[in-house]
Structures are given as C-alpha cells and as structure tokens.
Amino acid sequence: MAASITNTASDEAAKFPRLVPDAYSPQIAPVFAWYVTRRLIPARFHAVRIVTESLEVARSIDSISDPVILVMNHQAWWDPMIGLALAATFWPSRRGVAPMDATQLEKFPILRKIGIFGIHPDDPKSMAAMVDFVQSRFATLPRPTLMLTPQGEFADIRAPLVLRPGAAALAAKFPACRVFSIAIEYAFWLDQKPEVLIRVQPVAGPEPISTTGWHRALTMGMQENGARLAAMVMARDQAPFTTFLGGAASGTNPFYNLWNRLRGKSTELSTSHRR
C-alpha cells in the first residue's frame, strides 16, 4: 500500500513538473481540520461568525454535485485556516484542493496532506499547469471544491480589489462549476481577542462565458460581498450573525474576570445600555 501511494505521488510529480501536487491523506486531513477548528482558532479568536442571511447559501454548497470554486479575499495568514473551518462546518462531505506558493509550501509540507498544492505564481507555465492539474482533480474527485484567493497576495481590506487572472481563467475553463464569494474580516469588538466575520454569496457567471467576463463577474461579486460585510462589521452588532465557533461572554482578562466573579458581578463587556 505504501509503495502504491509513493508510486502515485511520483507519477503525479512527473506529470505536473511545473507545480507540487497535493498528497491528500484521509488519515491526516480530518485530524488537522479538527485541530484547526476546535483548538487553534478558538485559542486565537473570540468568535467566528457568519452573516445569518448567508447561512443557507453556505450550507447548500455541501449538496452541490458539480465542482465548486470558492473565491476569498486575502488579508492574512489565517485565511486558509478559516476556509478549513468553514469546510469542516458547512460542506464536510466535499473534498477540497487549494493552491499555495510552492516556495512557502516547502516550509509547511504537512499542508499537502490536506489538499494544498504548490504553484509558482509568477511563472506562466506553472499557471497553465495549474489548469491541467485542477482538471485532473475535478475529473477524479467526488464533488470537489477549489478554494482560491484571487488577489494572489495579502491585501488590506481597505485597498482596491485587484484580482490576478487565474481564477477567471479557471471559472471559464470549467463552465459547469458553481462559484461562490467568501468575504472575511478580522475585527476587534468588545473582547480582548478579535472576531472573524464572514459572508457567503453566489457569483453569477457571465454571458457569454469568457475569461474577461468572469474576471469582471468575480471582481464585482467580491466587491459587493465585501461591502455588505463591511457595513455589518462597522455596525459592531452581532445580531445579524450566527456564531459557529467560540462566542463566550466577552471579558477583559482572566484576573479581572476572576475579581468580578468574586464580587458577584458579570464579566461580560457590553455597550447595550447606551443604545
């Protein structure tokens, strides 16, 4: 069995010399997802919340029989970890793949075990190889999901949205795919830890289908989704959101919280009395 897996990996490396294929492990991937979702993210963030009006959209992804492409804005190192938590929570039956800079992937080889493959973003031949690689995954995986960050690099949430052409080329290449935009923001509200705030919406394809048309559709869809989420983030109100990770009562720090409990006072921070 081990020899078979090794041979398969070698065959793929020879078939796709311009990229680093993923080496998905059905044993390692679920454990990694559990650790990220149940340990790593809750330790670093107060809560992960999704806009309630987009909850059914997120859940519907799990039942789509065709391949799905997910496009996310790219602010931070945490983006793929949040994407993994979304997948584990809302579309757990799908098998995901996602590209990453091959140079960075060399530093974190375990990520290949969860479906990450390496590309050379500035090499046109590597980008062309990615299309062929994705096509091979779409043809062999059951209900595959491709997660992309089309900006291609970290970008401030306030900066104008500029997308590289790869995502549009892939969407045009696979017209049967369903495409969704995932907007993410990291914000400090009342707790000492930040919130992760998410909104999901479908992206309608262009008519006729073309790379240029998809580039325009993705740009407009991601801008609209991001703007709607931003308005809710600035309102600093958790009411329009559904919390799916964390979300315990806000506090300042363990010592202050203990002191307040000893005095019989609530440790929760709130500004509702001012409304």
Give residue ranges: language-model regions.
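Non-catalytic C-terminal accessory region of glycerolipid acyltransferases
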Residues: A2-Y24, A128-R275
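Short, polar loop motifs at secondary-structure junctions
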Residues: A102-E106, E185
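Membrane-anchoring hydrophobic helices of lipid-metabolizing enzymes
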Residues: M1-L84, R95, F108-I116, E195, ...
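Short helix-capping segments at alpha-helix termini
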Residues: T89-P92
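Hydrophobic/aromatic beta-strand patches that form the interior of the parallel beta-sheet core
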Residues: P99, F117, F180-I182
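Glycine-rich, highly charged phosphate/nucleotide-binding loops
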Residues: V48-E53, D123-V134
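Short internal beta-strands
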Residues: G96-A102
